Each structure stands twice: as structure tokens, then as C-alpha cells.
Amino acid sequence: MTTSHDRAVLNQILNPLMPTSDSGMGEVHLESDKVDHPGYTLSSQLEREAVRLAESMNVTDAIEKFTEAIQVCPLNPSAYNNRAQAYRLQNSPEKALEDLNESLRLAGPKTKTACQAYVQRASIYRLQGDDEKARADFAAAAELGSSFAKMQMVALNPYAAMCNKMLAEVFEKAKTGDN
């Protein structure tokens, strides 16, 4: 069994260019969405139904259900975020970006929804070849605690990629006994 200190040391060895968790920020505790709207409960229920539809690859019906959830409560950032994911599954990145922008506008700055929306938007930007926008959104998600975003930040950093490659080569040589 490893301690949190052991994991922190290993993380620093394996990801030397990433900040340590004791860099003054500590662990990020994300808030849940706080939506003050009479339709929020029904919207959340419709959203759960839409997620089930999407998980069964019934994406078109899922998008319709997410849209219904948004109509019931247009202030629900999670519904926009989840519909964006469905749009991505449908290969509609522009619609996904519109929903992600709206989700981020509505979400609190330190919410799980904001973190997820930043990661999704960064992924779209990266696929579109806009590494600057991708880097900015991955950085925002990394600050909110996304380990995936942290890995992507390293991947987008050419110096980190070079360091990781050299480190992998050193470990491989040590393992095989080559000098």
C-alpha cells in the first residue's frame, strides 16, 4: 500500500515538469453546479436519461433529450456540457464548441462541469490543430485537478516531450544493461 507521499514522489519522478500538489494550491476541491431555477430537478433527470441513451450509442435521441433538458432549465451548465459530448460523438465539433462555451459561461469557476468542459473544448481545439487554445484550456482544467489535462500539457510542451523521451531511453538502457 502506498502513502500519498509515495504517490507524490513517484508523480514528481514520472512527471518532472508538472507542479507538485504541495505547490501552495493543495488539492483542488471542485464544487457541484449551483443552479437556482425551478426546472433544474427535471432538467437533471432528463439529462440522466440522455446520458443513458448516449451510452447505448443512441446519440441522436440523446441530443434531443439533452436539448429538452436545456429547454426545461437553460441555466444548467452540465446539460450543455453533456450535449457537447454527444455532438462530438456525432462529429459536429462546431455545435460542441457552442455548447461548451455556454457551459463555461454558466458554470462556476471551480466546478466539475467547468473542468470537464475545458477538457472537452481543449480536445476539440487540439484536433483542429489550434494548440495555443488547447494549451490554455488544458491548463485551466489542470488547475482544476484534471490528471488527463496535466498529461496533455506535458504532451503539448516540446521540451517536456524531449525530456520524457530521453528519460524513457535512459530507463530502457538501464533495463537492458546498455551503456
UniProtKB/Swiss-Prot annotation:
InterPro entries: TPR-like_helical_dom_sf, TPR_rpt, TTC36
Keywords: Repeat, TPR repeat
First and last residues of every TPR repeat: 43-76, 77-110, 115-148
Any single GO BP term: tyrosine metabolic process
Pfam families: TPR_17, TPR_8
PROSITE patterns: TPR_REGION
Gene3D superfamilies registered for this protein in UniProt: Tetratricopeptide repeat domain
Family: Belongs to the TTC36 family.
Protein name per UniProt: Tetratricopeptide repeat protein 36
Organism: Caenorhabditis briggsae
Originating gene: ttc-36
